[in-house]
Structure formats: structure tokens, C-alpha cells
């Protein structure tokens, strides 16, 4: 199973978490991400604005998405960023953290194989090759991509926000979403 193979490799390369914890995170997070996106429109007409009659929300591809990866969670972040990019008809380039460059390459190669098996161009997702993985290569990618996403520490997020291109960042202590059906029961 690819999950076990990738989790073991991620643990051995990064020394973060246990292999079992990484397997659990791969299963839970990638499944949740897919379930959130499945069946939702991501391009074209999305909805009408309630408070602005006649105004419609339209979604369109942004182009090539540069994705800066963390060392702590390379597999799941690659999967999530890749799913979001491709679902919205974008391509993406993965910039691995240097301490997770080999498992990141392996993950992207597996995703590329599956994309090609579905009849789509494998080049919808690409990775900075391990031998070229560096801050300079990541900075060049950020400057060339149409929009960038960073997941990681403050330095990575700052690099995305400072590169002169639109960017989204999430780092330590940030949360992208909280979903709670009954918030009245929270302590």
C-alpha cells in the first residue's frame, strides 16, 4: 500500500512523528479533503449573492500554482494542494522542503502516474527535483508561478507573501477552517 510506503519513507527522511501517525494522517486528511471537494463546483458559475441581486460568483482557473511544502507533513500537503489545484483546472509545481525532498518526489511521481492513468496530462503536477531543491529554486518558482501557496513556518509564509505574486499562507498557529455542527456545546 502506498500510504505505508510513503509514511515510512517520510518518517525515515524527516524524523517527524511515527510511521503509524503518518499513515493515520494520510488516510484521514486526504479522505476528508476529497469529501469536502467532491461534487462541488470549482469553475464557472458558483452562486448568486443574496444581498446583491444580479451579482453572480464565478470561479476561474488561476494558472500555475506554486506550492511550498513543509517538512513535517509533505505527503498530505502535496495531496491536498494537488487535489485543490487540479480540481480548479490549474497546474501545480511542488517545492519540497529540503529535509523531505525525496519522499516529496516519490509522492508527486505516484500522483503523476495516477493522473496519467485517468487520461489527464501528468504534467499537471510537477516537483522541483531533489538535486535542485534549494531556497533559490523555490524563490525562482514563486516568481514564475501565477499564484502561490505556502504551508509551513513563518519564513515560508513570508516568502510567499513577499514574492510579488498573489499568495496564500498557512503556518504555525493558523487554521484554515473549523467546522462545528453545534457550537453551543463548546466549552
Model-based region annotation:
Residues 1-55:
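N-terminal Rossmann-like NAD(P)+-binding subdomain of aldehyde/semialdehyde dehydrogenases
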Amino acid at each position: 500500500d502506498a500510504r505505508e510506503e510513503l509514511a515510512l519513507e517520510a518518517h525515515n527522511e524527516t524524523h517527524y512523528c511515527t510511521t503509524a501517525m503518518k499513515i493515520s494522517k494520510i488516510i484521514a486528511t486526504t479522505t476528508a479533503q476529497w469529501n469536502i471537494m467532491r461534487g462541488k463546483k470549482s469553475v464557472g458559475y458558483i452562486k448568486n449573492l443574496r444581498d446583491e441581486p444580479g451579482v453572480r460568483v464565478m470561479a476561474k482557473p488561476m494558472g500555475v500554482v506554486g506550492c511550498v511544502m513543509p517538512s513535517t507533513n509533505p505527503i498530505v500537503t502535496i495531496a491536498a494542494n494537488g487535489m485543490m489545484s487540479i480540481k480548479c483546472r490549474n497546474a501545480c509545481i511542488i517545492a519540497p522542503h529540503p529535509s523531505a525532498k525525496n519522499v516529496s518526489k516519490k509522492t508527486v511521481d505516484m500522483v503523476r502516474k495516477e493522473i496519467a492513468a485517468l487520461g489527464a496530462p501528468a504534467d499537471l503536477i510537477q516537483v522541483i527535483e531533489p538535486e535542485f531543491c534549494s531556497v533559490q529554486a523555490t524563490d525562482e518558482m514563486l516568481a514564475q508561478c501565477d499564484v502561490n501557496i505556502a504551508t509551513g513556518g513563518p519564513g515560508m509564509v513570508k516568502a510567499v507573501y513577499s514574492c510579488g505574486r498573489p499568495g496564500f499562507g498557512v503556518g504555525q498557529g493558523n487554521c484554515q477552517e473549523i467546522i462545528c455542527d453545534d457550537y453551543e456545546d463548546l466549552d
